[in-house]
């Protein structure tokens, strides 16, 4: 039987992030990938130059036909662009009871740049995030969701706990990257019972565009394959590290991960 995963996110014309990264990740996990497009960007490795949302009726139609016919085994959300899109997506997820749900709360880039407005952030917090099986904020998104400043590992832990108790999400995976006082990358897992730190070797590369998208997509793919939540996160972290180690040196800026690294020819 073929497992099916669904990504609800935006398009990256450079192929490094968004649904392009998600579908590559699904394919690498031998999961059939389906997609609902929420916005289109004119994007290269050096930045985003233009973006337009998909009209709400078409977003609804995409979710309806995929959910009714293909019945995804797991779902992830990424860039939802504005509050109207967030509301539409939330309503359809509820209508079809689509779970497990990985919510990548795309609000702030990994460098700290805001990606959606305050109204959309509030909408995300009030409507979509409470449905999440697992929520995967980066450091800056965790600061917004918790109201806490994060400069070290202990503060990241406190933020994860605060987000859990305020958000309604079943599990928080707060992504710390390389924080002060640490030589490794780390994420914090909190499920209301135990708090765990996941360490990984740091990969030094400028070709890291789409890292967050790839992680949430890999978690989603593992869930679709029937792995439990913790093992899905562990497997996804390993996959992202290997994809970073085999990232692609393309374009003038931040290139993409090597999603298909076992298939890549060595130089």
Spans of model-derived segments:
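Conserved N-terminal subdomain of the carbohydrate kinase-like
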Residues: 2-7, 27-103, 107-110
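Short pre-catalytic strand/loop immediately N-terminal to key active-site residues, enriched for Gly-Thr
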Residues: 8-14, 195-209
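N-terminal basic/disordered segments at the start of proteins
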Residues: 15-31
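Short, small-residue alpha-helix embedded
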Residues: 20, 143-144, 205-229
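Phosphate-handling active-site elements
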Residues: 30-34, 195-196, 222-236
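Charged C-terminal helix
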Residues: 53, 230-267
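Nucleotide and nucleotide-moiety/phosphate-recognizing core
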Residues: 87-96, 170, 189, 194-195, ...
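Conserved phosphate/ATP/ADP-binding segment of small-molecule kinases
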Residues: 118-195
């Amino acid at each position: 039987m073929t497992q099916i995963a669904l990504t609800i996110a935006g398009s990256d014309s450079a192929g490094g992030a968004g649904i392009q990264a998600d579908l590559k990740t699904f394919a690498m996990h031998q999961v059939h990938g389906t997609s609902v497009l929420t916005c289109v960007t004119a994007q290269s490795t050096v930045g985003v130059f233009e973006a337009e949302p998909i009209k709400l009726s078409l977003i609804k139609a995409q979710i309806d036909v995929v959910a009714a016919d293909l019945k995804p085994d797991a779902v992830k959300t990424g860039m939802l662009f504005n509050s109207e899109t967030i509301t539409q997506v939330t309503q359809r997820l509820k209508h079809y009871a689509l779970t497990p749900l990985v919510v990548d709360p795309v609000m702030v880039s990994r460098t700290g740049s805001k990606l959606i407005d305050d109204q959309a952030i509030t909408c995300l917090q009030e409507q979509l995030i409470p449905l999440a099986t697992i929520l995967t904020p980066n450091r800056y998104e965790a600061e917004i969701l918790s109201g806490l400043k994060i400069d070290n590992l202990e503060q990241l832990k406190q933020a994860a706990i605060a987000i859990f108790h305020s958000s309604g999400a079943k599990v928080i995976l707060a992504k710390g990257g390389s924080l002060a006082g640490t030589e490794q990358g780390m994420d914090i897992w909190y499920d209301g019972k135990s708090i765990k730190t996941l360490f990984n070797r740091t990969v030094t590369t400028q070709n890291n565009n789409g890292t967050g998208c790839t992680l949430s997509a890999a978690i989603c793919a593992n869930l679709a394959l029937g792995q439990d939540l913790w093992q899905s996160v562990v497997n996804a972290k390993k996959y992202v590290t290997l994809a970073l180690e085999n990232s692609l040196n393309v374009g003038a800026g931040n290139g993409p991960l090597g999603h298909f690294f076992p298939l890549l020819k060595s130089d």
